[in-house]
């Protein structure tokens, strides 16, 4: 029974991770020091997903570089920022995210 509940919870999380405004960081355990803190965006849906746990998810989202951050709005990809060959996100990643989120919020009204 616990396994069924755990699987159901995991499925719901996957379905909901792109709801409304969501900031999703795709990464790997060995890159923890290269990730950015998503605390600034805590009023939105934020998730950090590790490749070792959800390989299929990475394939479905066509993640080519780590780390990668994707901003979604109601399931639509708005912005994708990745670390490229250097495995390091650009210095202005947080600014890019905030700019796009501000635009999304302005367009809601």
Model-derived regions, located:
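Short glycine-/acidic-enriched loop or helix-start segments at secondary-structure transitions
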Residues: 34-35, 58, 81
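N-terminal post-signal-peptidase region of extra-cytosolic proteins
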Residues: 51-57
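Extracytoplasmic/periplasmic, Sec-exported soluble proteins
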Residues: 50, 61, 89-93
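Local sequence-structure signature of Cys/Sec-based thiol-disulfide redox active-site neighborhoods
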Residues: 16-48
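Sec-dependent N-terminal signal peptides
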Residues: 3-12
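Structural micro-motif
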Residues: 61-72
